[in-house]
A protein has these predicted regions:
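Non-catalytic C-terminal accessory modules of carbohydrate-active enzymes
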Residues: 1-135
Length: 135
């Protein structure tokens, strides 16, 4: 996913626009692809970034969020929606190794269950309360 995300970004920086689809072997627009066309290209900057690069996946039915931290850099997201009324902000601090437990700050207006995953399968589950939470 990171490779695809970076290639879409390279093409955007080169051409100044998004394309209908991209070349499979190069950071270039696909053959006969239409420019200024979001279509499937809308997935990498939104869904892929949130779900696969930031590692945030939600199960609305169970009010459960999985945060699978793979990055070493600090990152975050504000107002991540959970259900009709939920707004959650996640801030993950910079780490020095993948096996270092992530430090996560969460601000939420609804309670939910969190599974935090990192390293070689390490994980912790926590009930997150309304307000500011440090994990």
């Amino acid at each position: 996913v990171m490779n695809h995300y970076n290639n879409v970004l390279k093409v955007y920086k080169k051409t100044g626009t998004f394309w209908e689809y991209y070349a499979p072997e190069d950071a270039a627009p696909g053959f006969m692809a239409r420019k200024d066309f979001v279509g499937w290209t809308g997935l990498p900057p939104i869904a892929d970034l949130i779900e696969y690069i930031f590692g945030i996946r939600a199960d609305i039915q169970d009010s459960h969020v999985t945060l699978d931290v793979q990055l070493l850099d600090a990152y975050g997201i504000d107002r991540y929606p959970l259900g009709a009324d939920g707004n959650i902000s996640f801030k993950v601090a910079k780490r020095s190794s993948v096996n270092e437990k992530p430090k996560v700050t969460i601000n939420t207006n609804i309670p939910f269950k969190l599974t935090l995953i990192w390293g070689d399968g390490e994980s912790v589950e926590k009930e997150v309360a309304v307000g500011n939470n440090a994990i």
